[in-house]
Structure formats: C-alpha cells, structure tokens
Regions:
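Generic alpha-helical secondary structure signal
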Residues: 9, 28-32, 36, 100, ...
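Hydrophobic or amphipathic alpha-helical targeting/insertion segments
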Residues: 78-85, 89-107, 181
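Transcription initiation cofactors for RNA polymerase, centered on bacterial
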Residues: 104, 108-113, 135
Length: 347
C-alpha cells in the first residue's frame, strides 16, 4: 500500500490548522521539523504495519488542532520520539530548532536507565509530573501522545491493550482533568473503558445505536421546530442532538442503579449561538435568558427542570441554561442553551 498520499494529507492538516495563527517563519520551522521526523523514522513501522511517521504527525495534529498550541509545541510533537528511537540527539535538535524546542524534546523523551528507582513505568510517571515544573507544554505533548496511542490501540495484543488502558484510566485521564483538558479527559476515559470492559462497552454502544435510530426522526423535527422559533426572532444558532458516550452512560447506570433503557438523559439537545452574529448588544448570559424566554413561550417547560449552570458551572467549567421542553410528540427533551465560547471554554 502506498502511504505517501496519506502521510502528506495528514501533515497538510497540521499546517492548515496552524496557518492562521503563526508567522511564515514559524511555519517554515514546523515544516522543517516534519521533514526531519519523516526522514528519521523512515525505516520504522508501527505494530499495525503503518509507517511510524503517521504517529508523530497525528500527535502534532492533536496539539495543533484540538489543543490549539504554539509552533514550538507542534515542532516538539513532530520530534517527540526522534531522540528516543533514532540516532538524533538533543544537541542535534538544539542546533536546528533552538533551546526551547530542545528542552521540550528532552523532557518528553523517556530517559534510559540501567536501574530504575521503582519500576520503569513509575519512573516515567514521575518524569511526566516533574515536567510540570519545567513547562506544561511538555505534558500536553505527552497527553496527546497517549491520546493517539489509545485511538490506535486495536493493533496491540490484548494484554498490552489492558495494561495501557489501565494506565490511561488511572494516570493520564485524571492528569488531563487536572489540566483542564476536559474533552481529552473524556476521550481517554471512554477509550480506556472500551478496552478494559469490552463486553459492557459493546453492549452500550449497540444500545446507543438502536436508541439513536429509534429517536432520530423525532429529534430532527424537534430541533427544526426550536431553530424555527429562534429564527423568527432573529437568532441564528445551531441546534444539535448529542448522545452521551458509553463510559458516561455506564457510570450513570451504576450511580443510579438502573439499566440502559431506564436511564434518563441518554442524550441532550444543545442550542449554540455566536455572540458576533447577534444584533442585540447583550451579554452571553442575557442572550441565553432571551432564548429561554422565547422557547418557553412556544414550548411547555417541565416544572422544576430549570438549572442555571451559568451561575453554577459544572466541574469542567461548562456553562449553560438547562431545562426540559415538551416536544409535539409528547416527549420531554433535555435542552441546553449556551454560546460557542462557553462550549470551547469547557473543552
């Protein structure tokens, strides 16, 4: 199989994600880092048989697109395995990319020791935590590295899958949570659950697919009705249905001691608006309240369902107004009202 078009396309996605926010000089350095990583890893393959270079490119894409970090961090992501797995040294990196990148690459490189103080894995954890004092960008690269490894874990042996998934759940997901990377934390937890509890994950995924198919048309009509109501009052917004992930469903089932089909709020409808498209000079909170007032004129609100998570945000800083509205089909729908900025802040 010719992987060259895949490699080039993935690398271009990194460049495109960075282009709006870095200088042409920095873009040249990023491209230079990509070419060095591609040359250094050329002979290497992943367990799946794919060229190894796909991994550092994917990590760089997470850093550039999902975490929105700077050029030097993306360069570090491209080079994060170069010193560990190829003849290149930290001094080589310093000569080409400067002290900042060299320092970051040195921190993310697993240190080879003859004797480990405890175990190799525990020493690695200690190195990651110690890097928090050096530069948090290094930890961001390590977490991105783990996220891509979890997304491609299917190529590993079952015992390795279980080991890596356990490490992810116990160390990397809580670390991502502490750093405020709530979307990454959720991804890591869900992927870990997929490999640690394969049967439960498979059952819930199948039930979710069935539930979505059974309710899709009704929810599409409800979203269309909501969007139409708001459009009539000059409010442009997105109205979408979001289904909770298997790990979130499983955790809620355990907490509430119910089966899947008796679990409430398996999905929610989110109304998202952009401040710069609003004609009225209102704050985000005022716009949320305006949308709430408009909707409760046209739809029946379930008594006692209103929750103001703008004044009292969730742990992940997610802010919204929550309520239950009655659809034309007579179903109470879980609705969340928020701005695009509120969503981004929680991720």
């Amino acid at each position: 199989m010719d992987y060259e078009p895949i490699v080039n396309n993935l690398a271009q996605q990194v460049f495109d994600a960075l282009a709006p926010r870095i200088t042409p000089e920095d873009m040249e350095r990023v491209r230079k880092a990509y070419l060095l990583a591609k040359e250094a890893h050329a002979p290497q393959k992943r367990k799946s048989g794919e060229p190894y270079i796909l991994h550092p490119i994917a990590v760089a894409l997470i850093v550039a697109k999902e975490l929105q970090l700077d050029a030097n961090t993306v360069i570090t992501a491209f080079l994060h395995d170069v010193v560990e797995d190829t003849p290149y040294t930290v001094d080589d990196i310093r000569e080409r990319f400067g002290n900042d990148v060299a320092g970051l690459v040195n921190v993310v490189t697993k240190q080879k020791k003859e004797i480990y103080q405890t175990t190799k894995q525990v020493d690695n954890y200690q190195q990651i935590l110690a890097s928090l004092h050096y530069d948090i960008r290094a930890v961001m690269v390590k977490i991105s590295d783990r996220l891509h490894n979890m997304r491609t874990l299917q190529s590993m042996r079952p015992d390795k899958q279980m080991k890596i998934a356990g490490e992810t759940d116990c160390f990397y997901a809580p670390l991502a949570n502490r750093l405020g990377l709530f979307e990454v934390k959720s991804d890591l937890e869900n992927l870990s659950f997929k490999y640690r509890c394969e049967l439960e994950y498979g059952d819930i995924e199948r039930w979710l697919q069935q539930d979505e198919a059974d309710n899709r048309e009704r929810l599409q009509r409800f979203c269309k009705d909501v969007k139409g109501t708001l459009k009539d009052h000059g409010i442009q917004c997105n109205v979408e249905t979001f289904w909770r992930r298997p790990y979130s469903i499983w955790r809620r089932m355990k907490q509430q001691d119910v089966d899947f089909w008796h679990l409430p709020n398996r999905y929610y409808v989110r109304i998202t608006f952009w401040e710069d498209t609003m004609d009225d000079p209102l704050t985000e909170k005022e716009t949320c309240l305006k949308i709430y007032n408009l909707l409760t004129r046209d739809f029946r609100e379930r008594p006692g369902s209103f929750i103001n998570q703008i004044e009292q945000p969730k742990e992940n800083s997610y802010q919204c107004l929550r309520l239950m509205l009655l659809s034309e089909e007579g179903v109470w729908e879980d609705v969340q009202i928020c701005s695009e900025a509120m969503v981004k802040a929680s991720q």
